[in-house]
Amino acid sequence: MITISAFAWVPSFARGQVRDLRVRWALEEAGLPYRTRLLEQGDQDTAEYRELQPFGQVPIFQEGDLTLFETGAIVLHIGERAEALLPKEPAARARATQWVVAALNSIEPHIMNVALIEVFYADQEWAKLRRAGAREFAANRLRSLANALGDKPYLDGDRFTAGDLMMSTVLRIIPDLMTDVRLQDYVARCTARPAFGRALDAQLADFRPDAPAEPAP
């Protein structure tokens, strides 16, 4: 059976955002069963885990002898087995892949730049100086994305693909950056899919409500 790694606990602001959600959603869209390997605090830094995921992040995807990391690679791999994510027609398949890459390369870095400043470093002077510029750069990218989406329900027209899965999870990171109603409606449309709801419920159910105990001195 497919196994994915996920955290057993994260702070409340990160719940529903940790990147195993993307893989859970893809597996739900594909109708593929899976189980989770829940990591306690520090497990991601062990030599065993770093051999599987050199950066100590979640998720990893394991099936038989195959181990993958990076959500883009994992979602595209799942899509190879699910026309619900990657169409069979070569040109449509290539366009879906294009939007997966665009979400991760052209949009997410700029949204994450804002997230890091506002969530982790908001009180530091350098962050105060960079915040407005970071938000404006991200807003420019989102304006370009909204124009590319136009009035279409999904990025490639009437059909939801892996590109929409990836893009909508990226856009959820900081919702208030989405000032264009077209993007707001787009994310609402994507996340209204039953597979997303199942994936989100599964992630939230795996989190312990209590914070991990501090290690003994």
Language-model features: where?
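GST-like domain detector, emphasizing the conserved glutathione-binding G-site
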Residues: 1-129
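Small/flexible residues
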Residues: 21-24, 191, 195, 210
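A generic structural-conservation signal
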Residues: 36, 87, 158, 199-200
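Short, solvent-exposed turn/loop segments enriched in Gly/Ser/Thr/Pro and often Arg
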Residues: 40, 162, 203-204
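Alpha-helix termini
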Residues: 44, 69, 119, 170, ...
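GST-like fold's C-terminal all-alpha helical module
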Residues: 103-194, 199
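Terminal-tail/helix-coil boundary detector
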Residues: 199-217
